[in-house]
């Protein structure tokens, strides 16, 4: 099975060390462009663009990278409760059209009550997933070309429609990650690829089996992916030294503050990440070559595969044997590590190298009539 390898655009900051300004670098458009172009040339399938108040806006960043890349896809967040599904569907179709079919979407429900309140969202965990399920139903139906009437608990639309369809049919693939039962049910029922953070393989296997069974109960099959950091070097010793160096500037106060911030979230996945290290520096190798040091201060994905190219490739193939075909990777600093992964790891894997998409024929059309329909449909309206 050929593997889809993704990289990451660090729109929330980058540097040589975690938890300190030392060794940091400015993250501007030019730097993000360098990373995107490196990923494009090295054969990555795409890049994940993060979302939230600590990040630059993912949609604007993705749009700005379209003209400077050729085949790279952009995995961009959809934010239920923050954005309406009709607006999000128009944005998604436009991004897909402008990129010639290089748009992918990542459903992000949010987990920090403080950040969500700042965005005007005052829903608890279960309510957010209810809203996300309704959002996704409307979003998918619009991209499928339906005119949608929907009267849910959280979302109400009447006569919603898209005039401009996406390039990818039936619609751009939808990714999603969540560890709670309600999150896995949403994944099983509506998404195309279920993402998990990089837990030990036996825990990931358990997750995949649960989601696969839930999807089968809905008559569906979905794909699987994992989100990991990578520290790959020419030798295993060099890789472990690089891992220790990454957290060498961390102090106990910074770790404690970070863990306190994570504790206020209601994310089951974040709780599972924190339990891998319990905020302590010792015993961070939680599974062969799987290191939890990143999660001491970084929210979300908090583990890294550490080793030389053949060793890390062997661990990736262990995940692939569970049914995972997509790996969303990152490393610090992201420009240098994109090259290291491409040069030291990719030769030991069966990597699916994406082709440059060919321009799609678009039917000519005049200006929309009365902001409601396109001219070629006048006779049917």
From Swiss-Prot:
FMNH(2) which is absolutely required for this enzymatic reaction, is provided by SsuE. Its EC number is 1.14.14.5. Pfam families: Bac_luciferase (PF00296). Keywords: Flavoprotein, FMN, Monooxygenase, Oxidoreductase. GO terms for biological process: alkanesulfonate catabolic process. Gene3D superfamilies: Luciferase-like domain. It comes from the Bacteria. Catalyzes the desulfonation of aliphatic sulfonates. It is an enzyme of class 1 (oxidoreductase). GO terms for molecular function: alkanesulfonate monooxygenase activity. This is Alkanesulfonate monooxygenase. It catalyses: an alkanesulfonate + FMNH2 + O2 = an aldehyde + FMN + sulfite + H2O + 2 H(+). Belongs to the SsuD family. Homotetramer.
């Amino acid at each position: 099975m050929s593997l889809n390898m993704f990289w990451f655009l660090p729109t929330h900051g980058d540097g040589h060390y975690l938890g300190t300004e030392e060794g940091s670098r400015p993250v501007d458009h030019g730097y993000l462009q360098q990373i995107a172009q490196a990923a494009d040339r090295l054969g990555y399938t795409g890049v994940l663009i993060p979302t939230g108040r600590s990040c630059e806006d993912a949609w604007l960043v993705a749009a700005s990278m379209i003209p400077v890349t050729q085949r790279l896809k952009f995995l961009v967040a959809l934010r239920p409760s923050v954005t309406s599904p009709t607006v999000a569907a128009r944005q998604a179709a436009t991004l897909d059209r402008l990129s010639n079919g290089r748009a992918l979407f990542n459903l992000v429900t949010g987990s920090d009550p403080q950040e969500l309140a700042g965005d005007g969202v005052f829903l608890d965990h279960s309510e957010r997933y209810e809203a996300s399920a309704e959002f996704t139903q409307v979003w998918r139906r619009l991209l499928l070309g339906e005119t949608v009437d929907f009267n849910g608990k959280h979302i109400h639309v009447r006569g919603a429609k898209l005039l401009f369809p996406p390039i990818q049919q039936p619609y751009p693939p939808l990714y999603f990650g969540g560890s709670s039962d309600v999150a896995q049910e949403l994944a099983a029922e509506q998404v195309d690829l279920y993402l998990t953070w990089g837990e030990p393989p036996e825990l990931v296997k358990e997750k995949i089996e649960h989601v696969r069974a839930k999807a089968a109960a809905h008559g569906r099959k979905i794909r699987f992916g994992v989100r990991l950091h990578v520290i790959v070097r020419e030798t295993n010793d060099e890789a472990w030294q690089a891992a220790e160096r990454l957290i060498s500037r961390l102090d106990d106060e910074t770790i404690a503050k970070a863990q306190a911030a994570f504790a206020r979230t209601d994310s089951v996945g974040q709780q599972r990440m924190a339990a891998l290290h319990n905020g302590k520096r010792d015993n961070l190798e939680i599974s062969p070559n799987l290191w939890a040091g990143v999660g001491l201060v970084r929210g979300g994905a908090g583990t890294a595969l550490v080793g030389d190219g053949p060793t890390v490739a062997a661990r990736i193939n262990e995940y692939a044997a569970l049914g995972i075909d997509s790996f969303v990777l990152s490393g610090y600093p992201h420009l240098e590590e994109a090259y290291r992964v491409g040069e030291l790891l990719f030769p030991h894997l069966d990597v699916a190298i994406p082709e440059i998409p060919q321009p799609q024929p678009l039917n000519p059309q005049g200006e929309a009539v009365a902001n409601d329909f396109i001219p070629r449909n006048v006779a049917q309206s």
